[in-house]
Amino acid sequence: MKKNVQIKGTKDGISIFLSDKASILELQQELSQLLADKKQNPYSGEKLEVQVQIGNRLFSEEEELEISTIIHNNSQMEISAFYSNVMSKDDAKKWKERDQIFSMATIIRSGQVVQVPGDFLLIGDVNPGGQIRSNGNVFVLGNIKGIIHAGFEGDKNAVVAGKFLYPSQVRIADKVYGFDSEDYKEVVDTDLFSAFVNDTDEIVIDEIHKIRKIRPEISNFQGGR
């Protein structure tokens, strides 16, 4: 009969495999017995991190805590993480949002802050004092005079494209580039340009067609909202 609980050494270290065919009660009982049988094992005397593989199922926080407690109380092992082959509804929703292009046709006025979890396409202008925050890339088909923050949660591979005018500011992750100097004050129109973080960790402003070379994956974007 196949065991519901197995401890194996893998290339990533020690893993505990819990069958997704067994009930949580069966797993708890079998895990407790297995660890009790291994009391005199080579793991004792030193804490070892283990991964818990739970297959095609998800554990609640309470179930994870119960498994963690059994391992903590009956061995010298500590859980580094639980790994599942499936995704929760919340995680799936977040993944879908990150992989999606959000779009609006409007003017972002002073005091307005638009924040999206994925890429963002704006058909319209961003006025001084207006702000866009996107976890992904930002594309503006209009004049940018406000603040554009791409890669808001730290993605330095994000890019910004649009017409950058005084006194706009571009932020990518934690990098900042300002168009607030006197050189930009007299510019009333410009072509579309792109902004991205280069190999020296600085924001560079370049011609729009350079995006395809710098970030070739952008040409594969699909979808919208």
UniProtKB/Swiss-Prot annotation:
What's the short name of a Pfam family annotated to this entry?
A: MinC_C
Q: Which InterPro entries match?
A: CAP/MinC_C, MinC, MinC_C_sf, MinC_N_1, Septum_form_inhib_MinC_C
SUPFAM superfamilies annotated for this entry?
Cell-division inhibitor MinC, C-terminal domain
Keywords per UniProt: Cell cycle, Cell division, Septation
Q: Does the keyword tRNA-binding apply?
A: no
| GO biological process terms, semicolon-separated | cell morphogenesis; division septum assembly; regulation of cell septum assembly
Q: What does this protein do?
A: Cell division inhibitor that blocks the formation of polar Z ring septums. Rapidly oscillates between the poles of the cell to destabilize FtsZ filaments that have formed before they mature into polar Z rings. Prevents FtsZ polymerization.
How it assembles, according to the record, is: Interacts with MinD and FtsZ.
NCBIfam families for the chain: PRK00513.1-3
Belongs to which family?
Belongs to the MinC family.
Return the protein name.
Probable septum site-determining protein MinC
Q: Which organism's genome codes for this protein?
A: Listeria welshimeri serovar 6b (strain ATCC 35897 / DSM 20650 / CCUG 15529 / CIP 8149 / NCTC 11857 / SLCC 5334 / V8)
